[in-house]
Amino acid sequence: MSSTQRLYSLDILRGITVAGMILVNNGWGESFEMLGHSAWNGMTPCDLVFPFFLFIMGISCYLSLVKSAFQPTVPVIRRIVKRTVLLFAIGLLINWFENAIWGDVLCFDHLRLWAVLQRIALCYGIVSLYALFCPHRYTIPTVVVLLAVYAAILLLGHGYVEDASVNVLAQVDLQLFGADHLYHKSAVDPEGLLGTISSVAHVLLGFYCGMLIRQRETVEQKVIALFVVGALCVIGGYLLSYGLPLNKRIWSPSYVLMTCGLAALLQALLMCAIDLYTQQSTRFTQSLRTFFHVFGVNALALYVSSELLAILLGYLGVSASVYEAIHTVIAPLKWASLAYALYFVLLNFGIGYVLYRKKIYIKL
């Protein structure tokens, strides 16, 4: 299998993830439970999309940095730092735009500092620098240490208590950044600072899988390696959840293992479908691949555009008008909400498809 084919299957998984992120982020009103995040302990399908993206980023880090032989040259480090800063800045821009569009253009008193792109930025920067300066044979031991340290923080610091006054994760964020710069819809900011510890372990597991994909010679060997790692992570996450429950809000160690395992298994299945049995594809499956490939090759651009577009359409009242039009046809609220979310996914697909046809791939 060529490098291009290998990346194609990864692009498909990235596209599935980004389309999923847009879908679950843009329901309207009352939604199906599976399209919403777990309130605290537990996990829904919605809770898979962000961790899948971090896992994919880990694989991409390895496949990207291997081109420079992991040499810590000035140009490579400069590119990592630049990308980290830009990702963080774009995340802040989205949060600022949500306030600015309602008139608070120069008011930063309530600007949320941490969100999805900010966490992606920190994890990308840390893991990329790790890849340049640390022996890769220590990747799994590093993951174990990070998860063990984070587990100790959760257990000793009341991390599973949904009360900001005692939860160590909430307290650190409150003391460092203040309540006005944090997420207000839960006791703990789901992208808070300490949660970055387990998120880095998450990306490192993806990095390790990227190493396996690169080092195995045949497609069959790559698939088997991913299946083994995926199965071990799922089993480990399940067993660990008895003492440390699955929890997306605090990015618990069991949640890391479970979601990384599921992502590895899905990547293995996609490699089977795309790289082993591609000759057996039908017109429908080819169209499906193209649909997700559109999202996969411009993942960052389409995620950012979807966030900005959702804010803009909400401000202009377009979102409400479209939803009301849908609701007149589809009476049940949950189904109307799903229909609106699907409409919004297709709207962003249209933007992505224009870029795709013109071979415009926006990268940082």
Can you annotate each of these PLM segments?
Residues 1-364:
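Alpha-helical transmembrane segments and their immediate juxtamembrane cytosolic regions
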